[in-house]
Amino acid sequence: MGLSVAIVAMNEEASIGQTLESVRWADEIVLVDSGSTDRTCDIARQCGAKVLLKAWPGFSLQKSYAFENCTQDWILSLDADEVVTPGLAEEIRGVIKNPDALNGYWIPRKNLFLGKWTRFGGFYPDPKLRLFRRGRGVMTGAEPHPRIALKPEFDQRTGRLKTPMVHDAYPTLSSYMAHMNSYSSAGARAAVAKGYRGFSFFDIVLRPMATFIYNYFFRLGFLDGREGLLLHLYHAVYVSNKYAKIWELTKTRSSTKGGS
């Protein structure tokens, strides 16, 4: 049984090398690039990846395209800023060699913020269904955070691996804010597409406050120190921004209709 690693990327030269080096042992690496202007594609080719170029259609469709171009019996889906540790690699190899293995496996994830593992506040173990038999996984859910699920026609039983992958998405505050700006915009567009039109004091002020209080105090985010404080504070800002952008989108559409 072989393993394909599926990755989508754009301008990820700062992290893609470490990610690809961690899975060089895989039988195949498929990287779909959506127009990088840095060295992402060059680094990927140097690491032995098969690089495919495709304009960005959205995360679900781009990941699906990567899956479709995998040729091995098993697929491991990774983000461009995730690393497979040696212990996790050994566990994955054990799964794909097992003839009685299930159709999919959840992998815990260590999320790093400013270089620190955030163990509390709901950020760990953060399990993701990332390892699955080829042809049996499908992207589902709305942008900006769609997920992998098993296709309904297959056995839905899944397993859980013990060793976490490492997710180093936010090495700086600037990188975190840039990601959250993108996510809040995508989340707002998805909400408006579903018909959400609300604008309220609750959404803009109270919902972010409640999010901070719940994650920082009740889910023990304060145990992550200063990094935990900043993470949950700016996550609350993200929530407020998303609902403000929903209002902005609906206001713009209303103005356009009114002027037509």
Where would I find each of the regions flagged by the language model?
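Short, well-formed alpha-helical segments that are part of the catalytic scaffolds
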Residues: 7-28
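Glycine-rich, basic loop-to-helix element that forms the pyrophosphate-binding segment
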Residues: 54-70
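Catalytic-site signature of metal-activated, phosphate-bearing donor transferases
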Residues: 64-67, 74, 85-253, 260
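A conserved acidic beta->alpha catalytic loop
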Residues: 22, 33-42, 79
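Cell-envelope/extracellular polymer assembly enzymes that use nucleotide-activated donors
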Residues: 2-4
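Acidic helix N-cap motif at the loop->helix transition within catalytic regions
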Residues: 14-17, 38-47, 87-88
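Short acidic donor-binding/metal-coordinating loop in glycosyltransferase active sites
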Residues: 34, 54, 72, 79-82, ...
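Active-site acidic short loop of glycosyltransferases
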Residues: 25, 70-73
